[in-house]
Amino acid sequence: MEKTLRSCADQIVEASIRAVLPDEAVRRALKDFHPEGRTVLVAAGKAAWQMAHAAVAVLGHVDGGVVVTKYNHVKGKIPGVTCCEAGHPVPDANSFAATQKALELVQGLQPEDTVLFLLSGGGSALFEKPLIPAADLEELTHNLLVCGADIVEINTLRKRFSGVKGGRFAQLCAPAHVVSIVLSDILGDPLDMIASGPAYPDSSTCAQAKEIVQKYHLPMTEQMLALLEQETPKALDNVTTRITGSVRELCRAAASACRNLGYEPVLLTDQLCCEAREAGSFLGSIARTQAGQGKKLAYIAGGETIVHLTGKGLGGRNQELALAAAPAIAGLNAAVFSVGSDGTDGPTDAAGGYVDGDTLAALEAGGWSGYAALQNNDSYHALKAVDGLIITGATGTNVNDVAVALIGAVAVIITYFIDSSLFLGLLSKILGALSVMTVLDNFAFYFVFD
């Protein structure tokens, strides 16, 4: 197989993530930001620290601030800002404590004051004031993750049991104005669903929440059932919202990186939303169908897949997507890889996974069954065994995932066996050799005489 496929994949991943880092996006969003009174900063999500760091650098100072992000995502001190780390994807006591600090910060503000609210993916777990016991919230979050609910369904329910989600945080900031700068991690950029919309009017309804409970047969306490009857804010007049990054930019950056490496990019979708295994099989089948054309091609899909947990292994949706593509591209000069822009894929240290035409054989040689690994949701260990993990570390951003199928240029070999008694003498005189190769475009013709 072409040894540069992995190198190309790594370069594409790096360029894609670099294009959606929050620093420049926040600077652009604050270009015309001129607050009149006090400015306090609240940042929540996996990219919260980097967003806050960039904002303070632009503004020069803030009149107080709170950052709440995932464990090991704080990179240092920010002047005037308290930085907190907390649980994700399940909120914990540190999530609740950090959120309480933010609520105390915004109390007593005046109409001329501004709350600069920096929001990124992961905020639903990290920024939380539960209206139900923490144990019940933890159980609900676990049940939603296990049953395969998508992010919109998860956040629709989370809003019902939270004192800050679904626009309630913006209500608590009043009469101050809230300027919300958002890195979108949800397909289509629905502002009321990103981190469960703490500062945006909620479009979901109690009826929809009840349907989700019934769909997945989720256990509810009497308190939770009562909260399902309480509607969230449907209008907020003290909020301005700006989206600064999304999966569309991630895909565009991936396409540009592919083009720079000599691949012809094709954007399949930036709305990918299906089972991770299905997406991997689909990308692998595209690679098999298109291979052999003599062209370097790249098929790109952005979005966020889901995984139904059926086993007890270790992995994530991007690793599972990649592993599922391995059978389709076995033996081909092709690769499929998928990464999360935040550098985290499931409860692992990997951002995603990579497979190529050699992966399936390498797995089997090492005693692994790709099918069994998928059934046990153990893509992490399977890919680790064949150097198929993509590890970036925490990136400081979060705008969904990008998956790419790379197809290298392949020479098609046609061999002709010619009776030497008829043609050997003539061809020897004309071509001056007993075995010659003529290359035309990407096709190689071998003439073998016997």
Segments (PLM) and residue ranges:
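An N-terminal, well-structured beta->alpha segment
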Residues: 1-42, 50-51
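A glycine- and small-aliphatic-rich helix-loop capping segment at beta-alpha/alpha-beta transitions
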Residues: 54-64, 80-82, 103, 107, ...
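Glycine/threonine-rich beta-strand-loop-alpha-helix active-site module
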Residues: 67, 71, 75, 79-82, ...
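Glycine-rich oxoanion-binding loops at beta->alpha junctions
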Residues: 69-112, 152-153, 157-158
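Gly/Ser/Thr-rich active-site loops/lids in small-molecule metabolic enzymes
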Residues: 130-151, 202-217, 311-337
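A glycine/threonine-rich phosphate-anchoring loop and its flanking beta-alpha core
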Residues: 151-213, 217
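Accessory alpha-helical/coil subdomains and C-terminal extensions
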Residues: 176-179, 201-282, 286
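Internal helix-turn-beta structural module
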Residues: 323-410
